[in-house]
Protein backbone atom coordinates (compact mmCIF):
# COMPACT_ATOMS: atom_id res chain seq x y z
CA UNK A 1 0.00 0.00 0.00
CA UNK A 2 1.44 3.37 -1.04
CA UNK A 3 1.97 6.08 1.56
CA UNK A 4 0.69 9.54 0.73
CA UNK A 5 3.37 12.22 0.52
CA UNK A 6 3.18 15.15 2.96
CA UNK A 7 1.54 18.46 2.07
CA UNK A 8 3.79 21.49 1.54
CA UNK A 9 2.36 25.03 1.52
CA UNK A 10 3.76 27.84 -0.63
CA UNK A 11 3.29 31.42 0.56
CA UNK A 12 3.63 33.65 -2.49
CA UNK A 13 1.92 36.55 -4.17
CA UNK A 14 2.39 39.97 -5.67
CA UNK A 15 4.76 40.56 -8.57
CA UNK A 16 6.18 38.04 -11.00
CA UNK A 17 9.59 38.11 -9.32
CA UNK A 18 8.09 36.47 -6.24
CA UNK A 19 5.85 34.12 -8.22
CA UNK A 20 8.24 32.68 -10.86
CA UNK A 21 10.40 30.76 -8.36
CA UNK A 22 7.29 29.47 -6.59
CA UNK A 23 6.01 28.19 -9.93
CA UNK A 24 9.29 26.42 -10.68
CA UNK A 25 9.49 24.87 -7.22
CA UNK A 26 5.88 23.70 -7.42
CA UNK A 27 6.60 21.82 -10.64
CA UNK A 28 9.53 19.96 -9.08
CA UNK A 29 7.69 19.09 -5.87
CA UNK A 30 4.67 17.84 -7.79
CA UNK A 31 6.95 15.68 -9.93
CA UNK A 32 8.31 14.20 -6.69
CA UNK A 33 4.80 13.34 -5.58
CA UNK A 34 4.25 15.96 -2.89
CA UNK A 35 0.87 17.56 -2.33
CA UNK A 36 0.85 21.35 -2.50
CA UNK A 37 -1.28 24.29 -1.41
CA UNK A 38 -0.87 27.98 -2.21
CA UNK A 39 -1.48 30.72 0.34
CA UNK A 40 -1.64 34.05 -1.46
CA UNK A 41 -3.28 37.46 -1.63
CA UNK A 42 -6.11 38.58 -3.88
CA UNK A 43 -3.82 38.67 -6.92
CA UNK A 44 -3.16 34.95 -6.58
CA UNK A 45 -6.54 34.11 -8.08
CA UNK A 46 -5.23 35.15 -11.50
CA UNK A 47 -2.24 32.82 -11.61
CA UNK A 48 -2.05 30.32 -14.42
CA UNK A 49 0.41 27.51 -15.01
CA UNK A 50 1.23 25.12 -12.19
CA UNK A 51 0.24 27.53 -9.41
CA UNK A 52 -3.18 27.99 -10.97
CA UNK A 53 -3.83 24.26 -10.54
CA UNK A 54 -3.06 24.16 -6.81
CA UNK A 55 -5.55 24.31 -3.98
CA UNK A 56 -5.44 28.02 -3.28
CA UNK A 57 -6.28 30.01 -0.17
CA UNK A 58 -6.60 33.78 -0.44
CA UNK A 59 -5.89 35.87 2.62
CA UNK A 60 -5.64 39.54 3.48
CA UNK A 61 -2.19 41.10 3.22
CA UNK A 62 -0.91 44.64 3.64
CA UNK A 63 2.33 46.43 2.86
CA UNK A 64 5.15 46.27 5.38
CA UNK A 65 5.59 50.03 5.58
CA UNK A 66 2.90 52.52 4.69
CA UNK A 67 3.59 55.98 3.33
CA UNK A 68 1.56 57.67 6.06
CA UNK A 69 -0.03 56.96 9.41
CA UNK A 70 -3.38 55.99 7.89
CA UNK A 71 -1.73 53.74 5.31
CA UNK A 72 0.45 52.13 7.97
CA UNK A 73 -2.57 51.49 10.18
CA UNK A 74 -4.48 49.96 7.27
CA UNK A 75 -1.52 47.73 6.42
CA UNK A 76 -1.19 46.61 10.04
CA UNK A 77 -4.88 45.74 10.22
CA UNK A 78 -4.71 43.79 6.95
CA UNK A 79 -1.63 41.89 8.11
CA UNK A 80 -3.32 41.10 11.40
CA UNK A 81 -6.41 39.82 9.63
CA UNK A 82 -4.23 37.83 7.25
CA UNK A 83 -2.41 36.25 10.18
CA UNK A 84 -5.70 35.12 11.72
CA UNK A 85 -6.88 33.75 8.38
CA UNK A 86 -3.58 31.96 7.77
CA UNK A 87 -3.59 30.33 11.21
CA UNK A 88 -7.06 28.96 10.51
CA UNK A 89 -6.03 27.66 7.09
CA UNK A 90 -2.87 25.99 8.39
CA UNK A 91 -4.88 24.37 11.16
CA UNK A 92 -7.14 22.80 8.54
CA UNK A 93 -4.62 21.69 5.94
CA UNK A 94 -1.81 20.81 8.39
CA UNK A 95 1.21 21.24 6.07
CA UNK A 96 4.49 19.52 6.88
CA UNK A 97 6.43 22.62 5.81
CA UNK A 98 5.79 26.14 4.54
CA UNK A 99 8.06 28.15 2.24
CA UNK A 100 7.69 31.85 1.46
CA UNK A 101 8.96 33.86 -1.48
CA UNK A 102 9.11 37.38 -0.13
CA UNK A 103 6.74 40.26 -0.68
CA UNK A 104 4.15 41.33 1.84
CA UNK A 105 1.73 38.66 0.57
CA UNK A 106 3.93 35.98 2.15
CA UNK A 107 4.10 37.51 5.63
CA UNK A 108 0.81 36.32 7.18
CA UNK A 109 1.24 32.73 6.04
CA UNK A 110 4.87 32.54 7.12
CA UNK A 111 4.17 34.27 10.42
CA UNK A 112 1.32 31.88 11.19
CA UNK A 113 3.48 28.88 10.31
CA UNK A 114 6.29 30.04 12.59
CA UNK A 115 3.85 30.58 15.47
CA UNK A 116 2.46 27.08 14.93
CA UNK A 117 5.92 25.51 15.00
CA UNK A 118 5.70 24.30 11.40
CA UNK A 119 9.11 23.96 9.66
CA UNK A 120 9.65 27.04 7.50
CA UNK A 121 12.01 28.51 4.92
CA UNK A 122 12.09 31.64 2.81
CA UNK A 123 13.58 32.22 -0.62
CA UNK A 124 15.22 35.55 -1.47
CA UNK A 125 15.36 36.32 -5.17
CA UNK A 126 17.60 39.39 -5.07
CA UNK A 127 21.11 40.20 -3.87
CA UNK A 128 19.51 42.27 -1.09
CA UNK A 129 17.31 40.60 1.53
CA UNK A 130 13.88 42.13 0.96
CA UNK A 131 11.89 43.88 3.65
CA UNK A 132 9.32 41.12 4.09
CA UNK A 133 12.03 38.49 4.27
CA UNK A 134 13.98 40.61 6.77
CA UNK A 135 10.91 40.61 8.97
CA UNK A 136 10.66 36.83 8.73
CA UNK A 137 14.33 35.83 8.67
CA UNK A 138 14.72 35.47 12.41
CA UNK A 139 11.71 33.17 12.65
CA UNK A 140 12.40 30.63 9.88
CA UNK A 141 14.77 27.66 9.81
CA UNK A 142 16.40 28.27 6.42
CA UNK A 143 16.99 31.26 4.13
CA UNK A 144 17.51 30.15 0.53
CA UNK A 145 19.26 32.69 -1.70
CA UNK A 146 19.54 33.22 -5.43
CA UNK A 147 22.92 34.95 -5.19
CA UNK A 148 26.02 33.66 -3.44
CA UNK A 149 26.22 36.86 -1.41
CA UNK A 150 23.19 38.73 -0.04
CA UNK A 151 23.26 42.01 1.87
CA UNK A 152 21.02 43.15 4.75
CA UNK A 153 21.36 39.80 6.52
CA UNK A 154 22.14 40.02 10.23
CA UNK A 155 25.41 38.19 11.04
CA UNK A 156 23.66 35.95 13.56
CA UNK A 157 21.42 34.65 10.76
CA UNK A 158 24.31 33.60 8.50
CA UNK A 159 24.10 29.91 9.54
CA UNK A 160 20.59 29.81 8.07
CA UNK A 161 21.74 30.83 4.59
CA UNK A 162 21.73 28.26 1.78
CA UNK A 163 22.68 29.29 -1.77
CA UNK A 164 20.22 27.41 -3.97
CA UNK A 165 20.09 29.80 -6.91
CA UNK A 166 17.01 31.28 -8.55
CA UNK A 167 14.62 28.74 -10.11
CA UNK A 168 13.80 29.55 -13.74
CA UNK A 169 11.08 28.50 -16.14
CA UNK A 170 11.19 25.07 -17.75
CA UNK A 171 11.35 26.74 -21.17
CA UNK A 172 14.62 28.43 -20.16
CA UNK A 173 16.11 25.14 -19.02
CA UNK A 174 15.04 23.56 -22.30
CA UNK A 175 17.12 26.17 -24.17
CA UNK A 176 20.27 25.66 -22.10
CA UNK A 177 21.72 23.17 -24.57
CA UNK A 178 21.89 25.92 -27.20
CA UNK A 179 25.54 26.99 -26.96
CA UNK A 180 26.49 30.63 -27.46
CA UNK A 181 27.13 31.33 -31.14
CA UNK A 182 29.51 34.23 -31.45
CA UNK A 183 29.24 37.03 -33.99
CA UNK A 184 30.85 36.13 -37.30
CA UNK A 185 32.80 38.57 -39.47
CA UNK A 186 29.97 39.40 -41.85
CA UNK A 187 26.98 37.71 -40.23
CA UNK A 188 23.96 39.24 -38.50
CA UNK A 189 24.15 40.63 -34.97
CA UNK A 190 21.23 39.46 -32.83
CA UNK A 191 20.33 42.01 -30.15
CA UNK A 192 17.54 41.46 -27.61
CA UNK A 193 16.10 44.21 -25.41
CA UNK A 194 13.94 43.32 -22.42
CA UNK A 195 12.47 46.08 -20.30
CA UNK A 196 10.98 44.18 -17.40
CA UNK A 197 7.34 43.30 -16.91
CA UNK A 198 6.11 46.66 -18.23
CA UNK A 199 8.91 47.75 -20.50
CA UNK A 200 11.31 50.59 -19.74
CA UNK A 201 10.98 53.95 -21.42
CA UNK A 202 14.66 54.80 -20.98
CA UNK A 203 15.59 51.80 -23.13
CA UNK A 204 13.10 52.86 -25.81
CA UNK A 205 14.59 56.35 -25.87
CA UNK A 206 18.30 55.57 -25.73
CA UNK A 207 18.80 52.35 -27.70
CA UNK A 208 17.45 53.47 -31.13
CA UNK A 209 19.50 56.67 -30.88
CA UNK A 210 22.61 54.72 -29.90
CA UNK A 211 22.26 52.23 -32.75
CA UNK A 212 21.77 55.07 -35.22
CA UNK A 213 25.23 56.36 -34.23
CA UNK A 214 26.98 53.12 -35.18
CA UNK A 215 28.89 52.85 -38.47
CA UNK A 216 26.66 51.77 -41.34
CA UNK A 217 28.66 48.57 -41.82
CA UNK A 218 27.67 47.48 -38.31
CA UNK A 219 24.22 49.02 -38.24
CA UNK A 220 22.90 47.16 -41.25
CA UNK A 221 23.89 43.80 -39.72
CA UNK A 222 21.82 44.34 -36.58
CA UNK A 223 18.62 42.41 -36.01
CA UNK A 224 16.99 43.70 -32.87
CA UNK A 225 13.97 42.41 -30.97
CA UNK A 226 12.91 45.08 -28.48
CA UNK A 227 10.24 45.04 -25.80
CA UNK A 228 8.54 48.42 -25.45
CA UNK A 229 5.60 49.85 -23.61
CA UNK A 230 2.50 49.80 -25.83
CA UNK A 231 2.36 53.59 -25.86
CA UNK A 232 6.00 53.78 -27.00
CA UNK A 233 5.82 51.32 -29.89
CA UNK A 234 5.01 53.79 -32.65
CA UNK A 235 7.68 56.26 -31.57
CA UNK A 236 10.35 53.57 -31.38
CA UNK A 237 9.29 52.24 -34.78
CA UNK A 238 9.75 55.72 -36.27
CA UNK A 239 13.16 56.01 -34.60
CA UNK A 240 14.36 52.91 -36.44
CA UNK A 241 12.99 54.02 -39.82
CA UNK A 242 15.79 54.77 -42.23
CA UNK A 243 18.54 53.26 -40.07
CA UNK A 244 18.79 50.02 -42.02
CA UNK A 245 18.20 48.07 -38.81
CA UNK A 246 15.89 45.04 -38.87
CA UNK A 247 13.73 45.80 -35.83
CA UNK A 248 11.02 43.61 -34.31
CA UNK A 249 9.07 45.55 -31.69
CA UNK A 250 6.39 44.38 -29.31
CA UNK A 251 5.10 45.00 -25.81
CA UNK A 252 5.34 41.29 -25.02
CA UNK A 253 7.34 38.40 -26.45
CA UNK A 254 5.86 34.97 -25.79
CA UNK A 255 9.05 33.31 -27.05
CA UNK A 256 11.63 34.97 -24.79
CA UNK A 257 13.52 31.71 -24.09
CA UNK A 258 14.07 31.14 -27.81
CA UNK A 259 15.07 34.77 -28.38
CA UNK A 260 17.51 34.63 -25.46
CA UNK A 261 19.04 31.46 -26.85
CA UNK A 262 19.91 33.07 -30.19
CA UNK A 263 20.91 36.51 -28.85
CA UNK A 264 24.49 37.73 -29.19
CA UNK A 265 23.82 40.44 -26.60
CA UNK A 266 20.95 41.32 -24.29
CA UNK A 267 20.16 44.77 -22.90
CA UNK A 268 17.81 44.61 -19.94
CA UNK A 269 16.83 45.70 -16.48
CA UNK A 270 18.42 43.73 -13.64
CA UNK A 271 15.51 41.92 -12.05
CA UNK A 272 16.36 38.65 -10.34
CA UNK A 273 14.51 36.51 -12.88
CA UNK A 274 16.25 38.22 -15.80
CA UNK A 275 19.71 37.76 -14.28
CA UNK A 276 18.95 34.12 -13.48
CA UNK A 277 17.78 33.40 -17.02
CA UNK A 278 20.84 35.09 -18.53
CA UNK A 279 23.25 33.10 -16.37
CA UNK A 280 21.37 29.84 -16.83
CA UNK A 281 21.70 30.18 -20.61
CA UNK A 282 25.08 31.91 -20.56
CA UNK A 283 24.22 35.06 -22.49
CA UNK A 284 26.18 38.32 -22.19
CA UNK A 285 24.20 41.36 -21.17
CA UNK A 286 24.29 45.07 -20.54
CA UNK A 287 22.24 45.57 -17.39
CA UNK A 288 20.57 48.91 -16.65
CA UNK A 289 19.15 48.67 -13.12
CA UNK A 290 15.84 50.34 -12.33
CA UNK A 291 17.10 53.07 -9.98
CA UNK A 292 13.93 53.30 -7.89
CA UNK A 293 13.67 49.62 -6.94
CA UNK A 294 13.24 49.02 -3.20
CA UNK A 295 16.64 49.06 -1.47
CA UNK A 296 18.17 49.53 -4.94
CA UNK A 297 18.19 45.75 -5.25
CA UNK A 298 18.53 45.79 -9.04
CA UNK A 299 21.87 47.56 -8.78
CA UNK A 300 23.01 44.89 -6.31
CA UNK A 301 21.87 42.19 -8.75
CA UNK A 302 23.73 43.84 -11.63
CA UNK A 303 26.90 44.25 -9.56
CA UNK A 304 26.81 40.54 -8.73
CA UNK A 305 26.56 39.66 -12.42
CA UNK A 306 29.30 42.12 -13.40
CA UNK A 307 31.65 41.08 -10.60
CA UNK A 308 31.70 37.50 -11.91
CA UNK A 309 32.39 38.72 -15.44
CA UNK A 310 28.95 37.81 -16.77
CA UNK A 311 27.58 41.26 -17.63
CA UNK A 312 28.27 44.96 -17.93
CA UNK A 313 26.53 47.37 -15.56
CA UNK A 314 25.42 50.77 -16.87
CA UNK A 315 23.66 53.03 -14.39
CA UNK A 316 20.60 54.79 -15.76
CA UNK A 317 22.00 58.29 -15.16
CA UNK A 318 24.96 57.51 -17.44
CA UNK A 319 23.00 55.39 -19.91
CA UNK A 320 23.08 57.79 -22.87
CA UNK A 321 23.02 57.30 -26.62
CA UNK A 322 26.70 58.27 -26.87
CA UNK A 323 27.91 56.03 -24.03
CA UNK A 324 25.88 53.06 -25.26
CA UNK A 325 26.98 53.55 -28.87
CA UNK A 326 30.63 53.52 -27.79
CA UNK A 327 30.10 50.34 -25.77
CA UNK A 328 28.25 48.56 -28.59
CA UNK A 329 30.79 49.61 -31.22
CA UNK A 330 33.56 48.12 -29.11
CA UNK A 331 31.69 44.88 -28.39
CA UNK A 332 30.52 44.30 -31.94
CA UNK A 333 33.96 44.95 -33.45
CA UNK A 334 35.69 42.83 -30.77
CA UNK A 335 33.16 40.00 -30.29
CA UNK A 336 35.63 37.87 -28.35
CA UNK A 337 34.64 39.97 -25.31
CA UNK A 338 31.06 38.79 -25.76
CA UNK A 339 32.21 35.17 -25.89
CA UNK A 340 34.24 35.54 -22.68
CA UNK A 341 31.31 37.16 -20.91
CA UNK A 342 28.93 34.45 -22.10
CA UNK A 343 31.23 31.80 -20.62
CA UNK A 344 31.46 33.65 -17.30
CA UNK A 345 27.70 34.09 -17.13
CA UNK A 346 27.10 30.40 -17.75
CA UNK A 347 29.69 29.41 -15.15
CA UNK A 348 27.68 31.06 -12.36
CA UNK A 349 24.29 29.89 -13.61
CA UNK A 350 22.32 27.49 -11.43
CA UNK A 351 20.19 25.33 -13.73
CA UNK A 352 19.64 23.04 -10.75
CA UNK A 353 18.13 25.81 -8.60
CA UNK A 354 14.59 24.44 -8.49
CA UNK A 355 15.88 20.98 -7.55
CA UNK A 356 18.19 22.45 -4.91
CA UNK A 357 15.36 24.48 -3.42
CA UNK A 358 13.12 21.42 -3.41
CA UNK A 359 15.84 19.47 -1.58
CA UNK A 360 16.03 22.23 1.04
CA UNK A 361 12.27 22.24 1.61
CA UNK A 362 12.00 18.45 1.76
CA UNK A 363 14.92 18.41 4.18
CA UNK A 364 12.83 20.43 6.65
CA UNK A 365 10.32 17.59 6.96
CA UNK A 366 11.07 14.85 9.49
CA UNK A 367 11.65 11.46 7.83
CA UNK A 368 11.65 13.05 4.35
CA UNK A 369 15.34 13.95 3.94
CA UNK A 370 16.65 12.32 0.79
CA UNK A 371 13.14 11.44 -0.39
Swiss-Prot record:
Q: Which CDD domains match?
A: GT28_MurG (cd03785)
Molecular function in Gene Ontology:
UDP-N-acetyl-D-glucosamine:N-acetylmuramoyl-L-alanyl-D-glutamyl-meso-2,6-diaminopimelyl-D-alanyl-D-alanine-diphosphoundecaprenol 4-beta-N-acetylglucosaminlytransferase activity; undecaprenyldiphospho-muramoylpentapeptide beta-N-acetylglucosaminyltransferase activity
What's the main place this protein lives?
membrane
Keywords, sorted A to Z: Cell cycle, Cell division, Cell inner membrane, Cell membrane, Cell shape, Cell wall biogenesis/degradation, Glycosyltransferase, Membrane, Peptidoglycan synthesis, Transferase
Pathway assignment: Cell wall biogenesis; peptidoglycan biosynthesis
InterPro entries under this entry? GlcNAc_MurG, Glyco_trans_28_C, GlycoTrans_28_N
Q: Which GO terms describe its biological process?
A: carbohydrate metabolic process; cell division; cell wall organization; lipid glycosylation; peptidoglycan biosynthetic process; regulation of cell shape
GO cellular component terms given for this protein: plasma membrane
* HAMAP family assigned: MurG (MF_00033)
Q: Which family does it belong to?
A: Belongs to the glycosyltransferase 28 family. MurG subfamily.
Q: What is this protein called?
A: UDP-N-acetylglucosamine--N-acetylmuramyl-(pentapeptide) pyrophosphoryl-undecaprenol N-acetylglucosamine transferase
Taxonomically, what lineage is the organism?
Bacteria, Pseudomonadati, Pseudomonadota, Alphaproteobacteria, Rhodospirillales
Encoding gene (name):
murG
Amino acid sequence: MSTQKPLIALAAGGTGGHVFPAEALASVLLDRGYRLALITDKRGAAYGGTLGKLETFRISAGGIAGRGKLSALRSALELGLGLIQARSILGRIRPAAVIGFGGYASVPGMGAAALAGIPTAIHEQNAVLGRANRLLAGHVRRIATSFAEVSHVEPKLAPKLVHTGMPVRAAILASRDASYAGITAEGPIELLVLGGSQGARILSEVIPAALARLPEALRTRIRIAQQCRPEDLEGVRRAYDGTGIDATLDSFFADVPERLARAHLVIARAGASTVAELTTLGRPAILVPYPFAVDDHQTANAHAAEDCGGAWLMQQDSFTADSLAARLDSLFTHPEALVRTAVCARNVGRPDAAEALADLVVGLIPNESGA
